[in-house]
């Protein structure tokens, strides 16, 4: 998957759609991790994305299957 950008819509395995409002790139031990802030409907969520998998303690988790770029 390409690098995530503001305005992208991320589609997850369960059908959840996350509209990306902001993204930051973090480098850690030679890995690039994307910190994504976005909205699902009207709810704001934050998550970390690495290798097309989103994970956070109390945010969005799961595999991203598609990235739509309007």
Q: What residue ranges belong to the model's regions?
A:
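Conserved "cap/hinge" positions at secondary-structure junctions
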Residues: 13-14, 28
């Amino acid at each position: 998957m390409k690098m995530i950008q503001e305005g992208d819509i991320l589609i997850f395995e369960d059908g959840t759609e996350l509209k990306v409002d902001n993204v930051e790139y973090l480098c850690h031990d030679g890995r690039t991790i994307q910190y994504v802030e976005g909205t699902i409907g009207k709810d704001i969520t934050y998550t970390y994305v690495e290798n097309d998998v989103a994970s956070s303690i109390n945010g969005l988790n799961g595999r991203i299957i598609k990235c739509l770029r309007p």
